[in-house]
Amino acid sequence: MAIWLDQDSRVIVQGMTGSEGRKHTQRMIAAGTRIVAGVTPGKGGQSLTFEEDPVPVFDTVAEAKAATGANTSVVFVPAAHTKAAVMDAIDAELDLVVVITEGVPVADTAAFVAQAKKSGRTRIIGPNCPGIISPNQSNVGIIPSTISGPGRLGLVSKSGTLTYQMMFELRDIGFATAVGKIGRAHV
């Protein structure tokens, strides 16, 4: 039984138009993740094509959620813009926000974590984390989808590399969900 992320998760990629966002969007789609939109302020109205399917880009998370029914976001924006991106997702009342970006100032992280707690709705994983995966259902972040298959185990790890290693070592058993949260992450 997957937790927090499953085949019904509808995912927004914040920063999808940037090189990292685009690269990892392609990889997440190839893993079966339902990417429903991208968000990049000032680039709303565009669309990017992945595996021959266009993915619309919006200026705000609220616009993307209204148009697509999204409930999850993954953040691939520069550290200087991460706080604003995460606050946008919290204000739109998404269920889960996965912050991949590293180098986010501690004060910015504290501010968006406090806002998420105040909202009572949005769960934050990250920043500076590899993300979350429910194998053969959805993969949000940068965890390789090929290192393990589905199963009954759950994993929460403070280390990205050890997340991958544990998933690989226990691949014959498989995972319901694995979360790489890194040291200062807030779940």
Predicted ranges, named:
Residues S148-H186:
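Short glycine-cluster motifs
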Residues E102-I125:
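Rossmann-fold NAD(P)-binding glycine/threonine-rich loop
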Residues R27-E51, P127, K181:
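NAD(P)-binding Rossmann-fold cofactor-contacting core
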Residues A66-T72, F76, A80-G103:
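Rossmann-fold NAD(P) dinucleotide-binding segment
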